Amino acid sequence: MKAIKIAIDGPASSGKSTVAKIIAKNLGYTYLDTGAMYRSATYIALTHGYTDKEVALILEELEKNPISFKKAKDGSQLVFLGDEDVTLVIRQNDVTNNVSWVSALPEIREELVHQQRRIAQAGGIIMDGRDIGTVVLPDAELKIFLVASVEERAERRYKENLEKGIESDFETLKEEIAARDYKDSHRKVSPLKAAEDALIFDTTGVSIDGVVQFIQEKAEKIVDMS
């Protein structure tokens, strides 16, 4: 049976990662959290106080402490920078609020996209992000673009933060998500947009199971036809 490449794109908190992880597990595919890679680069910049004028230093740190993914005992995915487990720290609000400017740096994107394509070569992979279908995997057999209202996405982020013990204000989250939407869709390098051949799916009011079922059925149909 052919193993395909699945690209899931969409704005912040549209449910990409949650859905991608479930589908990867169901299909026995590899899940690559590209957002965690950009968050890791952002964490480096913030930890060292680097600005957008010091891209070479961020890349140097990435080379010294490469990003890797490992499985935890419960099956969840852990993110490492060198030997440091950064799974939780890269989800903190300061990283979330700065990831847009770091991910907009051409040199950072070029390096991480190169890493992502190398991992995806064999197929049997599902990636989620902002530009997977348009830039990273333009040859993906299935491209999905998830959207949802700002209100719904803020609600999801608020619940996620509660579960992780991160304090947050609902109204502030709404403002931050709207601001990030604008930044992501207006940046010069790889702006957030749906690929021409992507299936656009509005997840507002749709359960996670409903979104998973929609994407998985499309994937299985493509595999059956190949």
From Swiss-Prot:
ATP binds at residues 10-18. One of its GO terms (cellular component) is cytosol. SUPFAM superfamilies: P-loop containing nucleoside triphosphate hydrolases. It catalyses: CMP + ATP = CDP + ADP; dCMP + ATP = dCDP + ADP. GO terms for molecular function: ATP binding; CMP kinase activity; dCMP kinase activity. CDD domains: CMPK. Its main location: cytoplasm. Its EC number is 2.7.4.25. Belongs to the cytidylate kinase family. Type 1 subfamily. HAMAP family: Cytidyl_kinase_type1 (MF_00238). This is Cytidylate kinase. It comes from Streptococcus pyogenes serotype M6 (strain ATCC BAA-946 / MGAS10394). The gene is cmk.
